[in-house]
Amino acid sequence: MNLQELLAKVPLLLSYPTIILSSNLIVPSHNDLISRAASTSAAEYADEKLIFFSTDHAIRLIFLPTFVASSFNLFAHYFNFINYSSRRKYYVLFTAIYFLSILTAIFHPIQSTCITLLIIKLLTTADESSPKIALNFKTILKTFVPFITLTLVILRWDPSFDASSGDVNKISTSLAAYALLILTLRYASPLILSTLSSSIGVVSKDTSVAQHSISRNKRFPLILVLPIFSFVLLYLMTIVNKTYNIQLLMVFVFFGCLSIFFLSLKDLFTEDGNQKKGGQEDEYCRMFDIKYMISYLWLTRFTILLTGIMAIVVHFLSFNEITSSIKTDLLSLLFVVVAEYVSSFSNKQPDSHSHNHAHHHSHLTDSLPLENESMFKQMALNKDTRSIFSFLLLNTAFMFVQLLYSFRSKSLGLLSDSLHMALDCTSLLLGLIAGVLTKKPASDKFPFGLNYLGTLAGFTNGVLLLGIVCGIFVEAIERIFNPIHLHATNELLVVATLGLLVNLVGLFAFDHGAHDHGGTDNENMKGIFLHILADTLGSVGVVISTLLIKLTHWPIFDPIASLLIGSLILLSALPLLKSTSANILLRLDDKKHNLVKSALNQISTTPGITGYTTPRFWPTESGSSGHSHAHTHSHAENHSHEHHHDQKNGSQEHPSLVGYIHVQYVDGENSTIIKKRVEKIFENVSIKAWVQVEPQNSTCWCRATSMNTISANPNSLPLQPIAN
């Protein structure tokens, strides 16, 4: 696995267990509901007990799984990950996700994460030609007996387990769920495998884009209506039974993590498909096998282990505990390790695959025709933005993990930090979009290209950093005078440490993916880098201040660390703001200013030239002025000059300045020769100029009195006509 594949897979490790947990928390947990019902009087509880449990089962076994499964299919369709070419495919996948959602409601979230991943691994590595042999009873039992044993031991060793109070039903429910799972894998696997063998929803070049769009629009109402309808039913159930309430914030986290999950998968698969283009036919490379992509790209070695560990961390952050005791905590960790060990036996990597999937590892180059691709593919495949795009997905996934913890813990500080991360993700996205757009060629609508978007993005990031610093200073000063004692320092330390690791990955990704191209692109990358650096410094400050507070119990360390971090960010952001604002205002530095003055002095001393007007020059980037430009100007003498700048020498391919100038010549001189002399002067100093030559007594707009008296400062550019 190369570095880029690792960066693309990390968001999957975070988003998948968060999807499992947040889907279970859309409605209050079963234990919370029992405690609420038990808090009422004994008579009321006895009367409502039957209604309560029947409603609870209806929500957890019907309405909530329907909402989760339909939402999953909706996002898969929206991100063009699965092409629902038939309703049968939609119904099969909906039923599979529905069943997995029921399992997540029965088992512990950590167990659900490992079991569902193992099921997906079994299905994607099974032989489609003989699924009954690949998934026979012996194989399935051999796979799930260790998990059945561990689940029963965890339930029995739970300190809250009480056989007399009906906790035995938990054991019977778990056994029934495993039995149903084994039977489903045994008898429904052929249908599921035939569905998984279908291609992903990426249209080949031979397929009509119009027909594909029409077919998507015809099926989209069916896919969209079911999530809305199931959510409305869930909401109506909360109205009927006041014990329930829908956690809208958890719905937001669930949808956000689904988006990150599919974007990360698409990112991972897009790179693999791009690598194959060099060695195989393009038509084949546009069609991917879902089974291959999942088993060979996503669920590779140690993926289940790492995802299970992430599930443990996410559960700890949400509930401040893994399970109810140390023994069951260790058993849960053993459950994750066993899941990885069992999955290694199903990870059969045959030498001869039915589709001959050759995995080519090659570096992405700029030679790929990305101009006509979607914005997503351009960010995902461009070598300068790919690593940063993968970090953006990782940062967004961690933001949703923080949001989940802040909702559960009611922590306003962590919620504020999550919103800060959302602002950072927005800044990263703006910077990446600007980096892609600046590489677009010039056009009739944008004759100078979009290169200055990089400068604008850098300036925007600088302003956002300035706002963040102001917010940090205000909050820190307030906490100096009104100290806030931190209590949940352990959880805060875990979150800050994870945030530090994520940001260190971001710095590493930036160093790996971004290169110094100079100019506006460099300013854009500098703005992105400063945002990542600001987050890293913030995480370092939180870790250090939290450790000092734990040791000394002095809350003053928190605002002091914030002031130091804010000062460092400010010192880094001010130079970025200064340079980008100067470029936006088209300001010339001293070196370029002297370059223009030297060229103008040469023009003023050229024989046959009486003067010049309106010299306008500004910094530019390579490729920004390659568009053919026609400058037509009519005078009383009816002179018309067209000039196309397609010079091939090195000085004009990468000019440092671009602009235009009007030059007046002596009557009787050849205008073509005069223009070529002026062009040669500018070419020698790497300035790309549009030159308009005109007779000395012409009535051009540039000869107006106001233009002739622009400046009388001898240190400024000589704007007035030069007299003979």
Curated annotation (Swiss-Prot):
Residues in compartment: Cytoplasmic: 1-6, 80-90, 156-174, 241-244, 320-386, 439-453, 513-528, 585-724
UniProt keyword Transmembrane helix, yes or no: yes
Main location: endoplasmic reticulum
Cellular compartments annotated: Endoplasmic reticulum membrane; Nucleus membrane
Record membrane topology: Multi-pass membrane protein
Keyword annotations: Endoplasmic reticulum, Ion transport, Membrane, Nucleus, Transmembrane, Transmembrane helix, Transport, Zinc, Zinc transport
Region of interest called Disordered, as start-end residue ranges on this chain: 614-653
One Pfam family linked to the record: Cation_efflux
Comp. bias intervals (Basic and acidic residues): 634-648
Entry superkingdom: Eukaryota
GO BP: any one term: zinc ion transport
Keyword Cell inner membrane: no
Gene Ontology molecular-function annotations: zinc ion transmembrane transporter activity
Transmembrane segments: 7-27, 59-79, 91-111, 135-155, 175-195, 220-240, 245-265, 299-319, 387-407, 418-438, 454-474, 492-512, 529-549, 564-584
One Gene Ontology cellular component: cytoplasmic vesicle
Residue spans, topological domain Lumenal: 28-58, 112-134, 196-219, 266-298, 408-417, 475-491, 550-563
Function: Probably act as a zinc ion transporter moving zinc from the nucleus/endoplasmic reticulum to the cytoplasm. Involved in zinc ion homeostasis and cellular distribution.
Note: Originally MSC2 was identified in a screen for mutants that show an increase in meiotic unequal sister-chromatid recombination (SCR). MSC2 may also be involved in chromosome instability, rather than SRC. Present with 1070 molecules/cell in log phase SD medium.
PANTHER family linked to this entry: PTHR45755, ZINC TRANSPORTER 7
Family membership noted in the UniProt record: Belongs to the cation diffusion facilitator (CDF) transporter (TC 2.A.4) family. SLC30A subfamily.
Protein name: Probable zinc transporter MSC2
Protein species of origin: Saccharomyces cerevisiae (strain ATCC 204508 / S288c)
